[in-house]
Amino acid sequence: VEDRARNKMLVELVKKASAGTRQLLVLSDRRFHCEFLHQCFPKTSGLYMGGMKEAQLQESSKKKIIFATFSQAHEGLDIPTLDTVILASPKSDITQSIGRIMRETKGKKNEPHIYDVHDPWSVFTAMYYKRMKIYRQGGFNIHGKNVEEPKSAFPQGKCLFL
């Protein structure tokens, strides 16, 4: 949360992922982290956290970028237009979180993209391997470090970027 280089990387990742027509959900386990990242995108982003009024949540759900806590996304986030999630902080149980972008809706071709930020410290390595197992079981095309890069600028289908 307080790592400047990591936050700079996250800001650049959000810029890159939001350049097209995708609607992003950026998840962190810290409110402060969500608020900090939100300040970098004041016009195009909203917050989705516990303690907010329903009207505020509704307004945020219309934004191109939504910064949310894992706990709020786990409990009551239902935004059918979401198609991209960025996991901004380490977590092992991500099934509910990635499920938010996996829903099929009428008139929308579902090609979910997940950006999983892998923190290399040993305490987070076990979480990373649990997430990778979930992605493989879900049939994701995996792109990133030590993995073949996508052939096109905008990969098709369910994609995971490391």
Give the location of each predicted region.
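Hydrophobic anchor at the start of a short beta-strand
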Residues: 24, 43-46, 142
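Conserved interdomain hinge at the start of the Helicase C-terminal
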Residues: 1-29, 35-39
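Conserved RecA-like P-loop NTPase helicase motor core
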Residues: 46, 50-138
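Helix N-cap/beta->alpha junction signal
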Residues: 29-31, 69-70
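Short hydrophobic alpha-helical runs that function as membrane-insertion/retention elements
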Residues: 86-87, 143-145
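Short, active-site-adjacent cap segments at secondary-structure transitions
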Residues: 33-35, 74-75
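Acidic, low-complexity intrinsically disordered tails
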Residues: 145-162
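Alpha-helical structural signal in soluble globular domains
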Residues: 40-41, 100
